[in-house]
Regions:
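Active-site neighborhood of thiol-dependent amide/isopeptide-bond enzymes
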Residues: 50-109
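A generic structural signal for ordered secondary structure
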Residues: 21, 25, 77, 114-116, ...
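Residue-level signal for well-ordered alpha-helical scaffold segments within enzymatic catalytic domains
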Residues: 24, 41-45, 82, 86, ...
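Secondary-structure boundary elements
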Residues: 1-68
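His-Asp-centered catalytic microenvironments across diverse enzyme cores
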Residues: 9-10, 97-209
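A generic structural micro-environment signature
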Residues: 17, 24, 31, 53, ...
Length: 209
């Protein structure tokens, strides 16, 4: 479990700004579930999704996501993990493969989090950001992610990674603008998923972001 608490180059939760916000969000609460919900809702609602708001820069490192208050789904999951780890709550990274336009190809990975709660075990949460048609919530033990999996070629993957996938980090760091990133969203075909340790999860959960 300690691996899900570690700082890294991307999940730089020891940054002073992250530590300060993590403490502020946790202050009114006592239980890990209450603190996790507060952090989740802050990232979901206060960090603007890059595409929804057509915002630059393209962020990746948790402290940069906090600084600029914008990011793709992946970047938002990086900040949420940092805030939760700063509060000593084990947090990892999960992925889906989703149709970008709900009509089949092209596809993209979609990133979100799993948090370990003593009362419930591992619980998946998606801080992507709500809008009409998307309503991700924190309501354990029920998972309410942004996108259910429903089309051929889509999948939700079982592993909970301790660090973001390298293919995700590389895609974010290579793009200079939100629209450039949109043209090169990371994808892994189901045929190659095992090469990235992406084993499909046996549950049916909608689209990429």
């Amino acid at each position: 479990m300690q691996d899900y608490l570690q700082p890294s180059a991307i999940i730089d939760w020891q940054h002073p700004d992250i530590l300060q916000l993590a403490a502020e969000l946790a202050a009114p609460w006592e239980t890990p579930a209450e603190i996790a919900k507060a952090c989740f809702e802050w990232v979901r609602d206060q960090v603007r999704h890059s595409v929804d708001y057509q915002m630059n820069p393209v962020t990746c490192r948790a402290s940069d996501v906090l600084r600029y208050r914008t990011g793709y789904c992946f970047a938002k999951s990086h900040l949420l993990a940092a805030l939760l780890r700063a509060n000593e709550i084990p947090t990892g990274f999960c992925y889906q493969r989703l149709s970008i336009d709900d009509q089949g190809a092209p596809y993209s990975l979609h990133g979100f989090n799993a948090v370990y709660l003593p009362e419930f075990g591992w619980y998946r949460i998606d801080p992507r950001g709500n809008k009409p048609g998307i309503n991700a919530q924190f309501a354990p033990p029920d998972e309410q992610l942004a996108y259910p999996v429903r089309l051929p070629g889509e999948a939700e993957f079982e592993p909970i990674f301790t660090e973001p996938l390298a293919i995700v980090v590389e895609a974010l760091q290579a793009a200079k603008t939100w629209d450039e990133a949109l043209l090169r969203l990371p994808d892994v075909s189901l045929e190659r998923a095992e090469e990235y340790s992406l084993v499909p999860r046996l549950r049916v959960g909608r689209r990429a972001g």
